């Protein structure tokens, strides 16, 4: 009899998997490229930091206007085609920015990055779940690690180039060349069928009843919005809160985000192992959202340097360590025939939150920074409530195989 502890994490589609993970590594670079090269680009386009901030906003716009479109395309024409579209858009950006003559064209290239991210998400997430049908949670949570590694590596590259007076453009051309290599690998790679093999499907939880879009579907989307908002609020406002209420200096307060990043990476690797062997994504989502809720309450009630540093680490672990990705995995289990559409809807709502939350927190900051932490607690609590709803519905919709001993 098969046991979960012997679950294989191998796949015959290894080249496709490498392409996807490597693309996410470079995607992590792409979303911070403009900010990391802000001074050089401001000089190039004869603008100021506000002008580059406007340029960066094009990434969010590109993502919002395209993600639903690519969800349909991915389900209809396949994952490879959509990922190739993403790579082409990334190539336009990385090779185009150094040669771009003005800010208007550069904004168009920033929009290309947002479009590329939409295409990569709607092709990459479903493809990983199809490559690893028995370990989809572990497969998608590693996406978070690859993005984080890219965002850790690129600032070091930019710093090295600045210290050695190397032209900033090489910092864009190098990722562009790597995307050329990914293109060649994609053309030779093999992708799985969008339908799970019957022999594999029999070992997975079987549907006992039809999932309800208005209940677990809506709850899953709300979970994604709440989870995203929980860590977004902390990463933007924790330093200011720590300075105002914990008496920390600016330099000390900024270090809270380093603890946040460490927590995020620690969670990714812990749960990548646990999800493969003994823990279901739905269990991980309930646990992490409960932990985030408790932590946000403690940060509000007992602000101190220790609490702010430890709280940032725990929020990074619980809210930014991959539960956004696990939410996609769980929602795709409920609606397996529309994985890319599910991903696009889920990620689009996160994009809307990315637009709305800064407006809300900006307003609250004028009233009192403590109310921003109250808002963060509210989002964490919403994530917990929706995670519990999805958890309870999971066992009504699915029949769990007797030989499956995963907790949750």
In which residue ranges do the predicted regions lie?
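Conserved MFS/SLC helix-loop-helix module at the cytosolic interface between two early adjacent transmembrane helices
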Residues: 65-101
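Helix-to-loop junctions at the C-terminal end of transmembrane segments
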Residues: 66-78, 267-280, 365
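Extracytoplasmic gate region of multi-pass secondary transporters
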Residues: 34-35, 213-266
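C-terminal transmembrane helical hairpin of 12-TM major facilitator-type secondary transporters
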Residues: 281-326
């Amino acid at each position: 009899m098969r046991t979960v502890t012997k679950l294989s994490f191998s796949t015959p589609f290894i080249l496709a998997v490498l392409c996807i993970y490597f693309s996410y590594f470079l995607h992590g670079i792409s979303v911070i490229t403009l900010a990391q090269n802000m001074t050089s680009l401001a000089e190039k386009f004869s603008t100021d930091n506000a002008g580059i901030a406007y340029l960066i906003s094009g990434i969010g716009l590109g993502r919002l206007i395209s993600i639903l479109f690519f969800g349909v395309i991915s389900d209809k024409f396949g994952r490879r085609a959509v990922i190739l579209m993403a790579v082409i858009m990334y190539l336009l950006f990385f090779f185009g920015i150094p040669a771009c003559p003005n800010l208007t064209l550069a904004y168009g290239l920033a929009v290309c990055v947002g479009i590329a991210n939409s295409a990569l998400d709607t092709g990459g997430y479903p493809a990983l779940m199809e490559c690893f049908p028995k370990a989809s949670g572990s497969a998608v949570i590693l996406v978070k690690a690859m993005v984080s590694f890219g965002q850790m590596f690129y600032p070091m590259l930019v710093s090295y180039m600045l210290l050695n007076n190397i032209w900033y453009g090489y910092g864009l051309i190098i990722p562009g060349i790597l995307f050329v290599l990914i293109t060649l690998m994609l053309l030779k790679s093999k992708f799985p069928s969008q339908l799970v093999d019957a022999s594999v499907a029999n070992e997975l939880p079987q549907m006992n009843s039809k999932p309800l879009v208005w209940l677990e579907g809506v709850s899953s989307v709300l979970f994604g919005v709440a989870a995203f908002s929980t860590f977004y609020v902390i990463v933007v406002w924790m330093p200011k809160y720590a300075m105002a209420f914990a008496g920390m200096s600016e330099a000390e307060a900024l270090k809270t985000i380093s603890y946040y990043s460490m927590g995020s990476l620690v969670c990714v690797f812990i749960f990548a192992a646990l999800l493969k062997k003994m823990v279901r994504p739905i269990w991980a989502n309930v646990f992490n959202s409960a932990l985030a809720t408790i932590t946000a309450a403690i940060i509000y009630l007992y602000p101190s340097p220790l609490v702010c540093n430890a709280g940032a680490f725990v929020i990074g672990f619980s809210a930014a360590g991959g539960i956004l990705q696990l939410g996609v995995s769980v929602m795709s289990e409920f609606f397996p025939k529309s994985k890319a559409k599910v991903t696009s809807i889920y990620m689009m709502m996160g994009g809307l939150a990315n637009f709305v939350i800064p407006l809300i927190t900006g307003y609250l900051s004028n009233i009192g920074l403590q109310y921003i932490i109250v808002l963060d607690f509210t989002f964490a609590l919403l994530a917990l409530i929706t995670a519990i709803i999805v958890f309870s519905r999971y066992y009504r919709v699915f029949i769990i195989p007797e030989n499956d001993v995963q907790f949750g």
